[in-house]
Every structure is written in C-alpha cells, then in structure tokens.
C-alpha cells in the first residue's frame, strides 16, 4: 500500500489536542475527515503522528502519515483540497511519499519543541494563547547555567505528571537544549530529545523559571533529578507557549524533503 507523510501546522487554541475524541474538535479528526472526502474512492488509513499534543499546544512542523489502496497521482491537488476542507487553525504544508515501513511515531528518532516566553512588566496583545507571560524578574544567566545539566540520558521522573508514569520507565535522552533571546521582551527555550513524557517540557521550563526567580536557594536541576519526585520540580506551565517544531528520522532522509515547504 502506498504510504504518505504530511507536514502539518496548527494553532492548538482551536482544538482539544491532536488525538481523535468523540464529539470534540481535534487536529486528527479534522484531517481524517478531509481525507475521507478527498479520497472517498481510495480510502486512507487512520493517521499516525510523531507527537500527540495536548489541548492548547501548537505545531509548526508536525509529521503524520497514512496509507491508501492506490497511489495518489497529484500532490498539489491533494494539498489544495486538504487546506480547503480543514478548519481554521490547521494548515497542511507539504506531502511526500515514504517507504511502506515508515511510521510517523515509531520511526521517529527525535522530537523538538520550543516554549515561548514574553518577559515584560506590561501586557502584550500577542501573548494570550501564544506564549507565557513572565512578569517577575528572571536571572537568565542562572537559567543558562542549569541547561546543560539536563543534557544526556537521565531519569526525568521529577519532570512529568506522576500519575502518568506509574510503573513506567522514565529515562529519556535530551539531545540539546538552549535559551534563545529573540528581543528584549521575547525569549524561547528550545529542547530536542529522543522522546518526551507527559508535560515534560512544560514542567522543565517552569522549573528553570523558578530557579531563575531565585525561588530555591539549595535546589538545582541536579538535585531535582536525583529526587525522582514530581513535588521537587517547579510548576507546570500552561500549554499556550508550547510548540512542536520538528520530528527527526535518521533512517528516512525523505523527511528532509517534507520540511522543504513549496514556494509560490
């Protein structure tokens, strides 16, 4: 069966997350509904996805895939039709054919997120639903010093929702993490790992901000990792500032082509 990967961008404020849910608007259901209309004579399988994002979380470059009974002859026509039929807040940016063994979730070797932070005393019209407003003073140098402690293969049990990890392995490898200062008021933390647990990025960034605020004198990322206890880490930030940026596939170079968005 032919196998196709889609590159999808979406505004999470419009949806109850990625995963299909009965009687609720989700990204998966909106794309599958559109595919069902477009490919009614060539039915598509259920979508697989690189990351099942929660309600309110956005995506700039999500990868998903589906299979059909017969080849799709015209990719341009498919993209135009998908974007006409999906609701406001979802854009399908590109499509490529991939090998039959490609699976958006299980073939993925790395995932990258950013968390956007607005750092100011005063409100901005562009923050609500798009970023987290940091109102108090932050020692950004102190935050930077903690970042590299997170890099590597570690047990991140302190940085995930406790109930979701009962009896599960909590070891993940953070491949890269950095603080990016885009302007005096705008920062973002970019984090890439081989996989993430529930709320892991939101708790990690919340903890880094608590450290930057000087909330703890004796607690550091090192000590929080050692504790393996969710109560030792910082707050879970809201989903507003979280964006899925990219999925990586070491064994599937065709995905590099997927991220080359066609220009007019």
UniProtKB/Swiss-Prot annotation:
Catalytic activity field: uridine(38/39/40) in tRNA = pseudouridine(38/39/40) in tRNA
MF term (GO), any: RNA binding
One annotated GO biological process: tRNA pseudouridine synthesis
EC number: 5.4.99.12
Binding-site positions, substrate: 113
Highest taxon of the lineage: Bacteria
Quaternary structure (record): Homodimer.
Record-given protein name: tRNA pseudouridine synthase A
Gene (UniProt): truA
């Amino acid at each position: 069966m032919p196998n196709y990967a889609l590159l999808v961008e979406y505004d999470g404020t419009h949806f109850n997350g990625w995963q299909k849910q009965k009687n609720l608007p989700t990204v998966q259901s909106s794309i599958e509904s559109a595919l069902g209309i477009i490919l009614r004579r060539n039915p598509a399988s259920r979508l697989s996805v690189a990351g099942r994002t929660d309600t309110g979380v956005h995506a700039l470059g999500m990868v998903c895939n589906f299979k059909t009974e017969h080849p799709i002859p015209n990719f341009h026509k498919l993209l135009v039709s998908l974007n006409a039929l999906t609701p406001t807040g979802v854009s399908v940016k590109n499509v490529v054919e991939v090998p039959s063994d490609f699976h958006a979730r299980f073939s993925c070797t790395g995932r990258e997120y950013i968390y956007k932070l607005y750092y100011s005393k005063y409100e901005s019209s562009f923050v609500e639903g798009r970023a987290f407003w940091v109102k108090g003073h932050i020692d950004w140098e102190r935050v930077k010093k903690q970042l590299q402690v997170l890099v590597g293969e570690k047990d991140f049990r302190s940085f995930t929702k406790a109930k979701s990890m009962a009896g599960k392995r909590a070891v993940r490898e953070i491949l890269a993490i950095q603080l990016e200062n885009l302007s005096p008021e705008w920062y973002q933390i970019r984090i890439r790992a081989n996989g993430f647990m529930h709320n892991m990025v939101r708790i990690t960034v919340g903890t880094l901000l608590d450290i930057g605020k000087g909330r703890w004198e004796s607690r550091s990322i090192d000590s929080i990792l050692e504790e393996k206890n969710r109560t030792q880490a910082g707050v879970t930030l809201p989903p507003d500032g979280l964006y899925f940026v990219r999925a990586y596939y070491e064994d599937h170079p065709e995905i590099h082509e997927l991220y080359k968005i066609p220009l007019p």
